[in-house]
Amino acid sequence: MAGIMQSLPGFRDFFPAECARRNYLTGTWRRVARSFGFREYDGPTLEPLDLYRKKNSGGEILGQLFSFTDKGEREVALRPEMTPTVARMLIAKAREYRKPIKWFSIAPFFRYEKQQSGRLREFLQLNCDLVGDASPAADAELLALLIETLRAFGLTSDHIVIRVSDRRAWMEFLATQGVTDEAQACEAL
């Protein structure tokens, strides 16, 4: 009986005080994203398992999925991230939207990860997607949105350090130093 009276490991209850804090957090995220011209979208929490197999063939995320076969005999998974969902949505209706597309979502995600302090198996995340503009200005806009979000929570330049880098440039540099294995390169970075 005690087991059914507790939330599952890695999941949590939101009592009114925690709910109020969560609503403040998500309300701030929405306000800032909208101030940058982003429009909110959402997708299903449950997706076909193949959507994640295609994106992460052999990747770590596949081992962290909450997946099962539903009553219709379909292999499905609770979404662990938003990128495959938004990609699927945009492919389905690509001609209906002018680029650049500036969308954001605030959604729950699920990963069956090893439990650690501060890492839950269900978590809420802000995603800001700027599609159809690969310019440095688009990258700068996303960084500005990030900074403004942190400022909205009271952080200042005394609290924030952003280091901009280019993984390809680092990989090229490491190759000149004799580091060609990707796993070694990631450790070096």
PLM regions: where:
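Extended, charged alpha-beta segments that form solvent-exposed binding/catalytic grooves
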Residues: M1-L189
